[in-house]
Amino acid sequence: MEVNYNNKKSSKFLTNIIRESDITNKLKVKDNGFKYKAICINTKKKDSLKIGIGNVTLKEKNFILVLENNRNRLYNRYKDLERLLREAIKNNIDLLVLPENYVPYEWLPVLTKFSAKNQIGIITGVEHFITNKNGDIPQAYDDCSRVHNLTAVILPYEDGKGGECNYSYLRLHEKTDLAPGEKQYIEGYGFSEATKNEVELFCWHNVWFPVFCCFELTSIQNRSVFQSYADMLVAIEWNKDVKYFSNIIESLSRDIHCYCIQVNSSNYGDSRIVQPTKADFMNKVRVKGGDNNIILVSSIDIKKLRDYQKKKYELQKDDRCFKPTPPRFDKTIVIKKINNTLQDELLKNEED
């Protein structure tokens, strides 16, 4: 599902700005029942991104209240979100990342309009919600059946004519694999889970990245697909098993050879930005705990990473800013990203 906010332009305008294609065959993935899509937003190229990770606490009681049709929409909860958005503006960040299950579905229009106005990207988990057989969200749960866990990827863009008008693109990703504990609660209350076997690869400011929601990250098959393509990988979580996911995210940064942004509930912690370097410098930022909701900020240097990746091993081992790329890492894809031609290659056949 995708939505464009503040946009009254023609469909031709949208086609020039937002391009989407099924790239499953181009990734040469063995048939695993998943569909892989590339979504490209035509925005000005950036050599680095300033990332803000939200250190916020998720409350299990809010999840239970959803299942009991008694959702928490207290004003204090909205004020917490508002404070984070003000911090994002104050710190002049490019992308704000929040954990799984954080924002109520009804508040997404607030985020998309904020994103468009301030040209700040937002990736956040959407609080569980329940639909009936027609896919509607009713007031009563008499006819309800499925519980949804969505990730919202909100990417802003301008009209391409001097930035006179600002817009934002919203993509809602349905979680592909629910955690066992999550399923236990959902089925225990008499519902079934809604899932969809689709994984997206985004291109925004010529930065390429997939987004994973917590338990999805445990799939070796899906997290390995984007090697050479991903400049960064985003993982939003609500996860108690911090050590297991810590091992995954550290290995992933080296195996895929990209920056990894992991955001978890602050009471479990290990929210961080990881880079493919030696262990001493691996974490650009890392945090756990705290009673106040805050944003931690760090920049990732996309140009520096690509310039390193395009070198052969003999030069990489002498340049110690990163660890060497793994075997079969495709440097031709890196060159295409540097030249900003990768999206044309991935999408051209679909559009022809």
What are the functions of these language-model segments?
Residues 13-44, 138-228, 247-248:
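Active-site catalytic loop in hydrolytic enzyme cores
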Residues 72-76, 98-102, 186-191, 209-216, ...:
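Short, flexible loop segments at the rims of nucleotide/cofactor-binding pockets, characterized by
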Residues 90-96, 203-207, 228-233:
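Short, surface-exposed connector motifs at secondary-structure boundaries
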Residues 48-70, 172-174, 207-216, 234-236:
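Active-site-proximal beta-strand elements of phosphoester/diester hydrolases
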Residues 12-22, 201-215, 312-352:
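Cysteine/selenocysteine-centered motifs that mediate thiol-based redox chemistry or coordinate metal-sulfur cofactors
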Residues 106-127, 135, 144, 208, ...:
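CN hydrolase (nitrilase-like) catalytic-core segments centered on the catalytic cysteine
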Residues 73-171, 239-241, 254-256:
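Cys-nucleophile CN-hydrolase/nitrilase-fold catalytic domain and related Cys-dependent amidase chemistry
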Residues 1-95, 102-103:
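N-terminal, active-site-proximal structural segment of metallo-dependent hydrolase catalytic domains
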